[in-house]
Amino acid sequence: MRVFKDIVGYSHDELCSDAYPMTEINNGLIYEVQAKMVTIDLDVKVNTGANAASEETEEDEGVDNAGSKQVINVVDAMRLVETSFDKKSYTGYIKAYMKEVLAKLADNNPSRVDAFKKDAADFVKSVLGKFDEYKFYTGENMDADGHVALMYYKPGEVDPIFLYFKDGLESVKY
């Protein structure tokens, strides 16, 4: 399994994994990750491992039934945190972020710089054009300089799509 970590900022949070269906789009600029809404069980399971017969009671004393809740699997597994932007603050953030990614590319993959500049400018323009369709997620450390994943729903779909800048991630094999 490969986990993709942020290369910008101080935290280098884990942001996504190839455990989820992912494809490259926009000339290899973006990873599109298919997420799903899943139900997680919030009940506390207490099993001391002693006498199994005595553990099978009708009602566990002292443990409330917490129920379950719906979550997005990528958000839950990668511990992503929803954040918010208005158009102006996102524009400021993305300019600074692109500058950092370009600096990393210039050092590590200079042949990719020109394509990144062109494709990233086109992509950001399209995001700003549909700005209200997106939600924004940071890694668990909420690094303000780090990668912000975009989430949206395709028309008629119930499961969300996450978008990540491929050049802003480092792949780590586990």
From Swiss-Prot:
* Keyword Cytoplasm listed: yes
Which Pfam families does the record cross-reference, listed alphabetically?
TCTP
Which InterPro entries does the record cross-reference, listed alphabetically? Mss4-like_sf, Mss4/transl-control_tumour, TCTP, Translation_control_tumour_CS, Translational_control_tumour_p
Predominant location of this chain?
cytoplasm
Superkingdom per UniProt: Eukaryota
Q: Which UniProt keywords apply?
A: Calcium, Cytoplasm
This protein's GO CC annotations? cytoplasm; nucleus
Ranges of residues in domain TCTP? 1-174
Where in or outside the cell it occurs: the entry states: Cytoplasm
What is one process in the GO biological process aspect for this record?
asexual reproduction
Among Gene3D superfamilies, the record links this protein to: Metal Binding Protein, Guanine Nucleotide Exchange Factor, Chain A (2.170.150.10)
GO MF entries: calcium ion binding
Q: What does this protein do?
A: Involved in calcium binding and microtubule stabilization.
The Swiss-Prot or TrEMBL record describes its family as follows: Belongs to the TCTP family.
Q: What is this protein called?
A: Translationally-controlled tumor protein homolog 1
Species per Swiss-Prot/TrEMBL record: Dictyostelium discoideum (Social amoeba)
